[in-house]
Amino acid sequence: MVNVPKTRKTYCKGKECRKHAQHKVTQYKAGKASLYAQGKRRYDRKQSGFGGQTKQIFHKKAKTTKKVVLRLECMSCKTKTQLALKRCKHFELGGEKKQKGQALQF
């Protein structure tokens, strides 16, 4: 269980800052894949018509988790940077801090 606070003070690489500043933390989420990317256009063209599936579909998945990527936005200059964390099964953003001698909850 990884619990990350919603704000953190860390170094900002922005041209205005270049110092430690307060950052707003959010979790990175991949955007929607474009229909007009060259690979997708080529794949769709190859798939159209008769002949069934033309490229392999990957089945041998090895990993059970993904690396968590944090998106840090500087509160003063709005510069955004990304920070990759280690792999984890449970990730929480801005959850309650642990109390001593309390049972674990998921």
From Swiss-Prot:
Key word Ribonucleoprotein present: yes
GO terms, molecular function: structural constituent of ribosome
Stored InterPro entries: Ribosomal_eL44, Ribosomal_LSU_eL42, Ribosomal_zn-bd
Disulfide bonds, paired cysteine numbers: none
Regions crossing the membrane: none
PROSITE patterns in UniProt: RIBOSOMAL_L44E
Keywords assigned by UniProt, alphabetized: Antibiotic resistance, Cycloheximide resistance, Ribonucleoprotein, Ribosomal protein
Entry's Gene Ontology BP terms: response to antibiotic; response to cycloheximide; translation
GO cellular-component term (any): ribosome
Record's keyword annotation contains Membrane: no
Other remarks in the entry: Confers resistance to cycloheximide, an inhibitor of polypeptide elongation.
Family per record: Belongs to the eukaryotic ribosomal protein eL42 family.
PANTHER family assigned: 60S RIBOSOMAL PROTEIN L36A/L44
The protein's name in its UniProt record: Large ribosomal subunit protein eL42
Organism: Kluyveromyces lactis (strain ATCC 8585 / CBS 2359 / DSM 70799 / NBRC 1267 / NRRL Y-1140 / WM37) (Yeast)
